């Protein structure tokens, strides 16, 4: 039975998360995994090449060695195990799932805020603080998007939650009430 990508990512990331937590190396492991993610994102063919059975084993291992060389023992073991089981194409998924676990532990929420005009740093900070309080997060990481159709106000989207305080939505609601 073949496991799907999400299942593989959850299993490997949970095992690594538990191990790093137990060994009090969660922060350093997290930092290392972020760097590993950047390597795979900067070299999109790397995971495919490391999984490519048509390449000689020596060639694949030559690609693998720099990753292992700079890794701490637990991350090195993860990389080696993922490679040995032919799951290198799942590496970024594993790191992404680890990020989810890490963010849950640290009560970090990622949100996108949409406004009609560019927000200042102060406005972003205010939105982060208000939203963090509303959802019980310790930290909110905002990305912002400008959409003139919003007219005014803000729309905040995070995971499965949308808070729409835009003028566009208020006008549409008023229109619906007037037409009813």
UniProtKB/Swiss-Prot annotation:
SUPFAM superfamilies: N-terminal domain of the delta subunit of the F1F0-ATP synthase. InterPro entries: ATP_synth_OSCP/delta_N_sf, ATPase_OSCP/dsu. Pfam families: OSCP. It comes from the Bacteria. It is a peripheral membrane protein. The keyword Cell membrane applies. One of its GO terms (cellular component) is proton-transporting ATP synthase complex. The keyword Ion transport applies. Keywords: ATP synthesis, Cell membrane, CF(1), Hydrogen ion transport, Ion transport, Membrane, Transport. One of its GO terms (molecular function) is proton-transporting ATP synthase activity, rotational mechanism. It is found in: Cell membrane. F-type ATPases have 2 components, F(1) - the catalytic core - and F(0) - the membrane proton channel. F(1) has five subunits: alpha(3), beta(3), gamma(1), delta(1), epsilon(1). F(0) has three main subunits: a(1), b(2) and c(10-14). The alpha and beta chains form an alternating ring which encloses part of the gamma chain. F(1) is attached to F(0) by a central stalk formed by the gamma and epsilon chains, while a peripheral stalk is formed by the delta and b chains. Belongs to the ATPase delta chain family. F(1)F(0) ATP synthase produces ATP from ADP in the presence of a proton or sodium gradient. F-type ATPases consist of two structural domains, F(1) containing the extramembraneous catalytic core and F(0) containing the membrane proton channel, linked together by a central stalk and a peripheral stalk. During catalysis, ATP synthesis in the catalytic domain of F(1) is coupled via a rotary mechanism of the central stalk subunits to proton translocation. This protein is part of the stalk that links CF(0) to CF(1). It either transmits conformational changes from CF(0) to CF(1) or is implicated in proton conduction. This is ATP synthase subunit delta. The lineage of its organism: Bacteria, Bacillati, Bacillota, Bacilli, Lactobacillales. The gene is atpH.
